[in-house]
Amino acid sequence: MTAILERRESESLWGRFCNWITSTENRLYIGWFGVLMIPTLLTATSVFIIAFIAAPPVDIDGIREPVSGSLLYGNNIISGAIIPTSAAIGLHFYPIWEAASVDEWLYNGGPYELIVLHFLLGVACYMGREWELSFRLGMRPWIAVAYSAPVAAATAVFLIYPIGQGSFSDGMPLGISGTFNFMIVFQAEHNILMHPFHMLGVAGVFGGSLFSAMHGSLVTSSLIRETTENESANEGYRFGQEEETYNIVAAHGYFGRLIFQYASFNNSRSLHFFLAAWPVVGIWFTALGISTMAFNLNGFNFNQSVVDSQGRVINTWADIINRANLGMEVMHERNAHNFPLDLAAVESPSING
């Protein structure tokens, strides 16, 4: 009997690192996208927490009137925010080493730019990591495609909109009330409620919520009972079981009789594709709408579009919205300008002396 012994070459450190990074046996999959995702998201999260607690006021409008956003400077969880980078910086890349001092960097809102850029890179890598793990497991790529909707929305409000408006100071503040302020000002300046892409986004979000609730309630109402009346119906399911856990025929029949026959899906796969696609496509359109309004391609303007035979204006709902827009525009950045541009009929008089 002859034994053949084969010497196994020791794998290099780099090879072992590559195998570990791409292994699907790890408790949490890392992947090559994860190599970039982990440090960028850790950086964004750490700076956000520190700045939300202790960042000094920021000169957001570039007029030497700083705005406080952190907890230690008088805010609470609702009013607090990471104040956007100053209008004095505009779209300039503003890392710490570009400022004369850390105090100057903080005064000009440097943390906002740092957080936003690291966050966008991190969530983009998270999307790539979803695709990478799906690829390694032999799955289809639709999880990453669905996640592209919130990535597109975040990119639109944090990057595309500031680029279109010419300054990171126009980006969305990182806080609860700051988000509401961004929405109000956006409506005042771009009439987003009258933009068709925003309407599609609203249909996507609310429609997705409705369809999700309908699907969940139908499934829960048509479970195949495997337990007694004294036990929870949930105890009748075992992870990985081959048999169906609910009766799709019963659910289909119920919904078909509740609405009409063809309103109900008879194919579970097409149903779940629809549940995923509806909100994703809606949010894609919203992100596209934000990106177009960033360059001032705004919502529809039907102001004073209805007149009587004498030429007098008959107010419509569009005129009410326009009046609200003007009021909101007057109120925001009230120290940065004396009069909103929409209300200025003539050029400002020259001042001599």
From Swiss-Prot:
Query: Where are residues bearing N-acetylthreonine located in the sequence?
Result: 2
Residues that coordinate or bind a quinone: 215, 264-265
Bilayer topology term: Multi-pass membrane protein
Cofactor descriptive note: The D1/D2 heterodimer binds P680, chlorophylls that are the primary electron donor of PSII, and subsequent electron acceptors. It shares a non-heme iron and each subunit binds pheophytin, quinone, additional chlorophylls, carotenoids and lipids. D1 provides most of the ligands for the Mn4-Ca-O5 cluster of the oxygen-evolving complex (OEC). There is also a Cl(-1) ion associated with D1 and D2, which is required for oxygen evolution. The PSII complex binds additional chlorophylls, carotenoids and specific lipids.
In its UniProt record, which GO terms are filed under biological process?
Answer: photosynthetic electron transport in photosystem II; response to herbicide
Q: Where is this site: Stabilizes free radical intermediate?
A: 190
Q: Indicate which residues the UniProt annotation says bind chlorophyll a PD1.
A: 198
Binding site residues for [CaMn4O5] cluster = 170, 189, 332-333, 342, 344
Binding-site residues for Fe cation, renumbered to this chain: 215, 272
Marked site, Cleavage, at 344-345
Q: What does this protein do?
A: Photosystem II (PSII) is a light-driven water:plastoquinone oxidoreductase that uses light energy to abstract electrons from H(2)O, generating O(2) and a proton gradient subsequently used for ATP formation. It consists of a core antenna complex that captures photons, and an electron transfer chain that converts photonic excitation into a charge separation. The D1/D2 (PsbA/PsbD) reaction center heterodimer binds P680, the primary electron donor of PSII as well as several subsequent electron acceptors.
Name of the protein in question: Photosystem II protein D1
**Organism whose genome encodes this protein:** Sinapis alba
